[in-house]
Amino acid sequence: MASVLCYADARGIPSHGCNRADTYVNEIAAGLVDACAEPTVERVEGCCALVDGRNGPGAVAAGLAMDTAIRLAGEHGAAVVCVRRSNHFGAAGYWANVALERGMIGMSMTNTSPMAVPTGGKTRAVGTNPLCFFAPADGDDSFQLDMATTVVPIGKVEVMDRIGRVCPPGWGVDRNGNDCSDAREICVSGGLHPLGGGADTAGYKGYGLGVLVEVMCSVLGGSDARDIGPTIRSWSARRDGPLGYAHAFVVIDPGRFAPGFGERLGGYLAGMRDLPGDVRVAGDPEREYERDAAENGILLHGNVARALKGLAARVGVEDLPGALEGLDGLGARSSLYE
């Protein structure tokens, strides 16, 4: 799990980085997540498999599922693996990147607790349900799409709340379904807009994508009825039972199709970047941020660093990186490799 958190912060995705550490620890401390659970591969049929997360940490179940998908894709050319009875698995891109590093196309997705208000509705009923697609190109290049199916992931709103800032217009709504910029209100009582916003700006497309992810994860994976869509428990240490999250992973070996995939993709991406203006492709900003983090360390907001120090004291961790010990009001840098 620590690797997943560092991956996110190192790529400039603080919503899924160390900002979430206390939530993971609180879940285990409250007995809501079984830290000792060992996920199992329940079923394998050709290039398809089903994993039971057994209410353990989501990252552990996701690791087993992606390893299984890569193995099956190596045998069959492509693979689909679903996971049920799991928990939050961190940034979806971390798991797609595992396939990318093996020279394969990787897709990862997960359902989440309902945070989005569907088009035409007034109450939250769909998760942020992220969808991720990574594809390798020649020259160490790649296409890396990692997106929530809401305007923003809820973690971004949580970060805005933690650092005391208001949200930009269009991110979410209050308890009455009206547009809202108060981060706490969006998180606690309101909800997020689907990707695209309201009906007049094609928010129904984001809503549809969110449902697509739900179908691929919980419906295809055989989750219990209460672990699908609107009835999934809130991701909180105060909830009354397991989350029952579900994930799906797709891995494709491009070498099983037309030769020259990496060269063609590399040429396509280069052509997009060469367009007039400042055109980048999915994954470029994160790679730039990661290069800086590898050289200078991961930048944490001061409030997040302070929360980490408090968490460390609570669980008895004493040997913190020096940057965290000497943090100031602007934040702290901790080495990517510490």
Set out the residue ranges of the language-model regions.
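Phosphate/diphosphate-binding glycine-rich loops and adjacent basic-rich segments that engage nucleotide
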Residues: 116-187
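Secondary-shell segments that build the walls of catalytic and ion/ligand-binding clefts
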Residues: 165-228, 232-236
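Active-site cofactor/substrate anionic-group-binding motifs, chiefly glycine-
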Residues: 16-70
